[in-house]
Amino acid sequence: VENAQATDGRRFWWWLGGALLVLVVVLVSAWTWVTVRGDGRAGHVVTGSADDLREATFVLLDGADVVRLRTDDLGGDAYRVSTSRDSGVRPAVSLADGNILTSLRGTGQDGPAIVEVVLHHSVRWHLRLGGGAKEQHLDLRGAQLGDVEFTAGASRIELTLPPAEGTQRTVLSGGANQVVVRLAGDAPVRVRAGGGAGSVTVDGSTQSGVAGGTVLTPPEWESATDRYDIDATSGVSSLTVDRTDGDG
């Protein structure tokens, strides 16, 4: 009798362990489908739940032909990254220490690598774009924004920033041909041309042949509570900083 009871006990635990294993496999498979594979019928789409997320860093690890990034109300999602069905790349996302790491994987298709990124407007975002691109267009006028950094080269960068809260810092450490930064409101802006520039235009005033290490600082910048700080640590051909009305 005791042997029979022991055998039944072992069978129960084997059955329970097997059931738990199946459950884990199902959950992992579901997570992989939603956050990595996406819905191929509408292109390659990756989303992730916002839950109680208040602040995060979005990192793009790989290069693309074109990167377009903006903020919007995504409901229950914190982010959405997508490429077209025929794109040569598809996004894959992993999470590490509060960083949303986005890589681009080959699809075998010959379509352009155009990456669309939408981030939830209620989350405070820090952005780090690597890998380089022909064009990068970031419309952040409605964002809650921390630092923005471009760590790889680009042919053209267009960056629209929200009104400054504290010191809004943008770093261009990868070099670029043309950079256009649009600021909302009248907060003062400091521009560093650490790597030199063919030309720098700030609020309509242009300097040509700008030497590396040049810093353009208006008198009111040091004492301002809300201000912009643009640091081009690598060389650029043309850097233009102008203003928007802040309303889009």
Show where each model-derived region lies:
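Hydrophobic membrane-insertion alpha-helices, especially the h-region
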Residues: 15-31
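FAD-binding FR-type
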Residues: 105-110
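Acidic, low-complexity intrinsically disordered regions
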Residues: 9-11, 27-29, 121, 217
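Short, surface-exposed interaction patches in beta-rich subdomains
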Residues: 84, 111, 158-248
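Terminal targeting segments of Actinobacterial cell-envelope proteins
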Residues: 1-14, 23
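Short linear S-[DN]-x-LW-Φ motif typified by the pepsin-like aspartic protease active-site region
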Residues: 33-103, 114-122, 126-128, 135-142, ...
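Short linear interaction motif-like sites in intrinsically disordered regions of transcription factors
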Residues: 14-16, 32-34, 126, 222
